[in-house]
């Protein structure tokens, strides 16, 4: 397989969903089918008038809403990509930021920029009709998860503009950019790779707010990269490669270097927990304290985690690891300038990713809200 996306046309989204579901363990697919059946029966029996239990929530100002920002989680990648541009807007043009609403997933939301006086609403048909009549634009990570899917649907119903912010590194199975969108990409190379020349997408290379935040922490982390054996960032949950590949890469690195294995937050399934337990019995250190990457010490390695570039931006040694990488993964490493680690060698660390702009969040804000709200 070459380094090209599997799903780059907007009409490929159903294929992406089918592919994603096919990667789930059989038990998860069975549970999902059962839940869907129960929900369908419940909907028929109760004739629900709401948008459903899984509908995202709306956090809206008292006045007009000209922009919706859709969060799929409250994790650092989503907040850096989607909340930091609003923070930049609130600093530069607070009167415009006052009209920004939010589409929220389940869970307790952190303090969001410009939203101190906002109120939460269920996304019922009445609320959507009455409160979003003046919607002019939405900002999303994509339309493949609930918040972004709802925001894009509402935008299309109202003829509003759709802005897509790249929030992570682009692997071969990345879902497609929505139709007729403006894409705020990390680099022009990423934009070209992701869209494959699509005429309906306007690409604006801006850089990564997450990586810029990592770069700005570098002075406070002097010496962090040389202190101890470091960490290997887990990705056992990933669908892009077989689980055995992620495990083999981790074992190769931690056994050679003494690094700790740092599970991804999504590694909560039975198979992942079993793998962690087996590694512990074999003497591998498992760093499951949940502290942010910036709080760790020493070099950073992974198969293709964004954490490799976060570490590089902060001046820490960082490498990519896979015993026998497929062609698409080697292309991925080249696209981001990731240096491959091999046993018995000391390669040059991965270099920081060059950014097209000095302040990605401010660049996104300036382009998204370049017109009067």
PLM segments and residue spans:
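C-terminal amphipathic helix plus adjacent low-complexity
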Residues: 1-23, 334-373
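Short, charged, surface-exposed secondary-structure boundary motifs
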Residues: 172-177, 193-196, 213-218, 294-295, ...
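Catalytic binding pocket for nucleotide-activated donors in carbohydrate/polymer assembly enzymes
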Residues: 205, 306-359
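Conserved catalytic-core segment of nucleotide-activated headgroup transferases in glycan assembly
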Residues: 78-85, 209-278
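Donor nucleotide-activated moiety binding/catalytic core segment of transferases
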Residues: 267-314, 318-319, 324
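Short acidic, S/G/P-rich loop/turn micro-motifs used as interaction or catalytic elements
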Residues: 73-79, 109, 144-147, 236-242, ...
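Active-site and donor-binding regions of nucleotide-sugar-utilizing enzymes
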Residues: 2-9, 14, 45, 49-199, ...
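A nucleotide-sugar donor-handling region in carbohydrate enzymes
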Residues: 20-56, 166-167, 176-241, 265
